Structures are given as C-alpha cells and as structure tokens.
C-alpha cells in the first residue's frame, strides 16, 4: 500500500498543485518498483531533470537483477516552500521500514543498508504545464 500520514494545513492553490505533482511522482515510482513491468510512463510524466535520470538508472539496475518491492510505503510532508512561481521545495519523510526487496520468486533480498526513514528536500518545478519532481537533496536517515 501507499499512505500519506501528514500534510501541512493552510497551503495555497500553487503549493497544493506543487504537492500534488510530488505525490504523482512518489506514487508512480512506488508502483513502478512494485510492478517492474518496464512501463515508466507515469514516472516520466511526473519527473524531470536529474531525478528522472537517477530513477531510470536505479530502475534498470533492479530490473536487470529481477527484483521488485513489496510492502507499505508511508509519506509525511513537513512543508511546501515556494521558491518562485514555478518552483517549490517540499520537505518530506519517506518511511521505508515496511518495504522489502524481493526476487521474482518472492525471496527477500537482504538490504545492506537496512530499513530506514529518509528525510529529503525535493525540488518540484512547473515544467510543460505540470509540476514535476526535478531533484532531491538528502537530509539524512532515521531523523524523521
């Protein structure tokens, strides 16, 4: 499953649209890693720049290894700060403690880095009329 545990109150229309763009990205990337069917159209529609390049690379690595993910993804949004009319920085915490990486036969693949929560600052930009995730700045793990 995919759950959003918290979103800040009092967002204006532009902040809300930027946040919806982030959620489109986050849900699309999670579904793509669960299905691993090669269809990245929803990811490509919600992602641009270095974030898209990085996702394609990591997806291909998992696809080549025959891996996919199962479990529950949880997201908390701390803030949505507009940088301009066409860019927002969204402070998020992704709880990946209930996500497992498995082989095509369903065997769990141990993660060398364990299961954690990840805190990121996400740049979302208005691109071709849609809010798309452009880049990430990692703040840390297990701090949210």
Show the residue positions of the predicted features.
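Core segments of small alpha/beta cavity-forming domains
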Residues: 1-68
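Structured, amphipathic secondary-structure segments that form assembly/contact surfaces
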Residues: 38-144
């Amino acid at each position: 499953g995919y759950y959003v545990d918290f979103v800040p109150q009092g967002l204006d229309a532009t902040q809300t649209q930027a946040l919806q763009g982030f959620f489109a990205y986050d849900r699309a990337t999670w579904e793509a890693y669960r299905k691993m069917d090669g269809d990245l159209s929803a990811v490509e529609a919600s992602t641009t720049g270095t974030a898209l390049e990085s996702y394609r690379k990591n997806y291909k690595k998992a696809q080549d290894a025959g891996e996919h993910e199962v479990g529950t993804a949880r997201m908390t949004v701390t803030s949505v700060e507009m940088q301009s009319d066409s860019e927002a920085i969204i402070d998020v915490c992704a709880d990946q403690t209930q996500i497992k990486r498995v082989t095509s036969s369903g065997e769990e693949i141990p993660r060398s880095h364990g299961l954690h929560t990840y805190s990121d600052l996400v740049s979302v930009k208005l691109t071709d009329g849609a809010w798309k995730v452009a880049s990430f700045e990692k703040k840390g793990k297990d701090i949210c």
